[in-house]
Amino acid sequence: MNINSANPPLVMVHGWGGSHQETWQKSGVEQLLTESGRTVIGVDLLGHGTAAKPHDPAAYSDISEPIRTAIGARSSTVDAVGFSLGAIALLHAATVNPNYFRRLMLVGIGNGVLDEHDPSETQRIVGGIEGTSATHDVLARQFGNYAKKTSNDPSALKAVLLRPRSKPFEPKDLKTISARVSVVIGDRDFVLPADRLIESFENCELTILKNCDHFATPENFGFIDQLLEFFGAE
C-alpha cells in the first residue's frame, strides 16, 4: 500500500555515537518504511555520520539545528522518530516550533530531560571514552566502546557531551506540542522512569519493551513493530 498521499515525510534521527546509516539503514528499519510507501528524511546530527565533526563543544549548542534545516520551510507538518540524543534533539525542535510534527516518537528518554543537567554524569561517559572510567562502571565503558566504533570521531563525540546545555524542558512548553506523541523505552533502560515526561504532553502514549536495555532498543522487534504501527506502515 502506498500511503504517501495520506502521510507526510518521516524524519529519522539517530542517537549519540550513531548515524542514520548505522541506526536506521543497517537494521533494515528504513527499508521497511520505504517499502510501505513512506518517504524518509534521514538526519545526521552534527558530530555524527556524514555531518561535520567539530571538536569545540560550543559548536553543539543548538542541538536541533540539523533537524530544523532538514525540515526546511515546509507549510505542513512532518512525522519524526528519534532515539536517545536524537529524541532530545527532536523535542528541542518541537519546543522551537510546536507545530512541526504530526506524530512524534521519542525513544530512549525519560524524566531526566525535565531535570537539571548533572555534569558528573557527563564526566562518567567522558571517562569511558578516554579509558579512565572505573573498571566496574559498565555503563561508562559501554558508551566508550560505542564512541570508538570505526566510523566515529571520539573527540567530536566528547565535544557533543560537553556542549553548553540549555535549561531543562518544562512541562508547560511540552503541553504546547500539537503532535501525537509516543514514548518507547526498554524495561532495562537506565533512563527510566518516564512518568513525569509522559504526563507533560497533551497527547502521549508509553510503550515499555520487555527485556530490552538502552543500546538494544533501535533493533528491538517490539520497538520496530510499535514504530510501524504508530506511523501507519503495517
Task: Place the predicted regions along the sequence by residue.
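The serine-hydrolase catalytic nucleophile loop
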Residues: 17-30
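Conserved alpha/beta-hydrolase
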Residues: 33-52
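Conserved acidic catalytic loop of the alpha/beta-hydrolase fold
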Residues: 61-78
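Flexible "cap/lid" loop of the alpha/beta hydrolase fold
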Residues: 88-132
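Hydrophobic, aromatic-rich cap/lid helix
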Residues: 145-170
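Short beta-strand/loop motif that positions the catalytic acidic residue
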Residues: 177, 183-185
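Conserved alpha/beta-hydrolase "acid-adjacent" motif
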Residues: 189-196
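Catalytic histidine-centered segment of alpha/beta-hydrolase-like enzymes
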Residues: 212-224
